[in-house]
Curated annotation (Swiss-Prot):
A molecular function (GO) term: structural constituent of ribosome
Gene3D superfamilies: 2.30.30.790
Organism name: Desulfotalea psychrophila (strain LSv54 / DSM 12343)
GO cellular component, one term: cytosolic large ribosomal subunit
Name of the featured protein: Large ribosomal subunit protein bL19
Amino acid sequence: MSIIIDRINQEQMRQDHPDFRPGDTVAVHIRIIEGSKERVQLFQGVVIKRQKGTMDASYTVRKISHGVGVEKTFALHNPRIEKIEVITRGRVRRSRLYYLRDLRGKAARIRERSLRR
């Protein structure tokens, strides 16, 4: 039984997403269907949480919109997500960045991670 479930999960999993971590700024392109119309909406912000797993893997992105903090949680293997772009790589020392909810302005900045390769 477990082999069948694993095989179904492998078929449903997406492999085209980039490698990103908490602290990275990402732009998530989401396909939205309203009635008969279909459009792509962009949600750009900082990844504050990454929940690992197989099919139930998810991540939370936070942005400030008109002075109000907005957080959205996305399933990693969601078929409605067109693509995920990594804008900048952030350098943080925590895996859950919930403390950013209390910070405003310059205090909420995240240092950029240098890529040494």
